[in-house]
C-alpha cells in the first residue's frame, strides 16, 4: 500500500492496574502513559508489530502509578522526551519517584503547559485539563495534518465530570478514547466503602457508563466515528455492560454500529486496536487498510 502516512491508535492496557496507549502517524510513534511494567509494554508493542526502540515520545496524563510506573525502567532502556505538567513532575518527585531525568537532563522532560500546542514530527498535540483527584490531570488531542489529509484523535480518561473544556477538545475528533469507569448501580450496590464510592462519583472521580454514553452521543454529532471505552472498573463494571449502555444511547439517536460508528471496549491486559489505517492522498481522509 503506497498511501502514506499510516495511522494507528491502539490501547495497549487500560484500567486500574495500568494504562498505556500507542499512537502512530507515519514513522512517528507516541505512548500516552506508561502504567504497566516496561516488560509488559514491550510485549504488548511486539504483539501489534511495534517496538519500544521506535517510540519517539511519551505523554503522561497525571502522576498516579497506573499511568507512570514503567517510566524509570523505560527511560533507562530507551531515553525519549517525556511530556508532563510541572505539577505532575513535582508530585512524582514528592512521592519519591526516581527523578534523575526530571530537571537535570533537558529536554528529556518537556513541561507541558495546559492548552498550549506542542509539535512532534507529523503530529501536533494540545493538552486540556481533566477533573480528577490529582495535582493536574490532562487529556490530549492529537492532530495529523498534511496538504491532502487531516485526522484527529483525543484521549480523555480519569475524569469525574464532563466540562466545557473537555467538550471543546473532543468535538471534531475522528477517534476518541473515553473513560467509562463504572455502572452507578453496580458501584452503589458493591463492596466499596462509602467514602470511596463518594470519591468515585464526585466531579473529581471517574466517569460513569451513562455519562460516557451521553457525551459520545454529542461527539457523533461533531464527526466522531471511532470510539473506545476505557478505564473500566473490574469491580463496578463489565465490558458488556459498558458497551450495551453506550450502544443503546446511540441507538436512540438513530445510529447503528459498524454503519454510523465503530465502538469497542479497551482490555485491562491486552491490546485493542481502535484505528489501523492509511491516509488516502486523493480522497484526503483515512481509510481502512483492509
What are these regions (language model features)?
Residues 1-48, 138-157, 175:
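Conserved beta-strand hairpin/beta-sheet module of binuclear metal-dependent hydrolase folds
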Residues 32-35, 55-63, 83-86, 154-157, ...:
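Active-site neighborhood of phospho(di)ester-bond hydrolases with catalytic His/Asp-centered motifs
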Residues 38-84:
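Active-site metal-binding motif and surrounding structural segment of the metallo-beta-lactamase
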Residues 49-51, 97-100, 147-148, 220-222, ...:
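Short helix-capping segments at alpha-helix termini
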Residues 55, 99, 173-174:
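Short, well-ordered alpha-helix to beta-strand connector turns
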Residues 69-78, 91-95, 237-244:
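Metal-dependent catalytic neighborhoods of phosphoester/phosphodiester hydrolases
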Residues 86-149:
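Metallo-beta-lactamase
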Residues 164-264:
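Cap/insert and terminal regions of metallo-dependent hydrolase folds
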Amino acid at each position: 500500500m503506497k498511501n502514506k502516512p499510516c495511522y494507528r491508535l491502539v490501547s495497549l492496557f487500560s484500567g486500574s492496574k495500568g494504562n498505556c496507549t500507542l499512537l502512530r502517524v507515519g514513522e512517528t510513534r507516541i505512548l500516552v502513559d506508561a502504567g504497566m511494567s516496561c516488560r509488559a509494554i514491550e510485549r504488548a508493542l511486539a504483539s501489534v508489530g511495534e517496538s519500544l526502540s521506535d517510540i519517539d515520545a511519551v505523554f503522561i496524563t497525571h502522576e498516579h502509578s497506573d499511568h507512570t510506573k514503567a517510566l524509570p525502567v523505560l527511560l533507562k532502556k530507551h531515553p525519549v522526551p517525556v511530556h508532563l505538567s510541572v505539577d505532575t513532575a513535582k508530585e512524582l518527585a514528592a512521592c519519591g519517584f526516581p527523578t534523575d531525568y526530571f530537571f537535570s537532563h533537558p529536554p528529556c522532560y518537556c513541561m507541558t503547559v495546559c492548552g498550549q500546542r506542542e509539535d512532534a514530527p507529523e503530529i501536533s498535540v494540545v493538552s486540556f485539563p481533566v477533573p480528577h483527584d490529582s495535582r493536574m490531570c490532562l487529556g490530549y488531542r492529537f492532530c495529523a495534518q498534511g496538504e491532502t489529509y487531516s485526522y484527529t484523535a483525543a484521549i480523555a480518561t480519569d475524569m469525574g465530570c464532563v466540562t466545557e473544556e473537555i467538550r471543546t477538545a473532543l468535538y471534531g475528533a475522528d477517534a476518541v478514547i473515553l473513560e467509562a469507569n463504572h455502572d452507578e448501580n453496580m458501584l452503589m450496590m458493591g463492596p466499596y466503602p462509602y467514602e470511596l464510592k463518594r470519591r468515585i462519583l464526585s466531579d473529581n472521580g471517574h466517569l460513569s457508563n451513562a455519562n460516557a454514553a451521553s457525551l459520545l452521543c454529542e461527539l457523533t454529532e461533531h464527526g466522531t466515528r471511532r470510539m473506545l471505552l476505557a478505564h473500566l472498573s473490574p469491580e463496578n463494571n463489565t465490558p458488556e455492560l459498558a458497551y450495551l449502555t453506550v450502544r443503546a444511547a446511540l441507538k436512540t439517536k438513530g445510529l447503528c454500529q459498524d454503519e454510523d460508528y465503530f465502538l469497542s471496549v479497551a482490555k485491562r491486559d491486552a491490546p485493542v486496536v481502535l484505528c489501523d489505517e492509511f491516509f488516502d492522498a486523493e480522497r484526503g481522509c483515512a481509510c481502512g487498510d483492509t
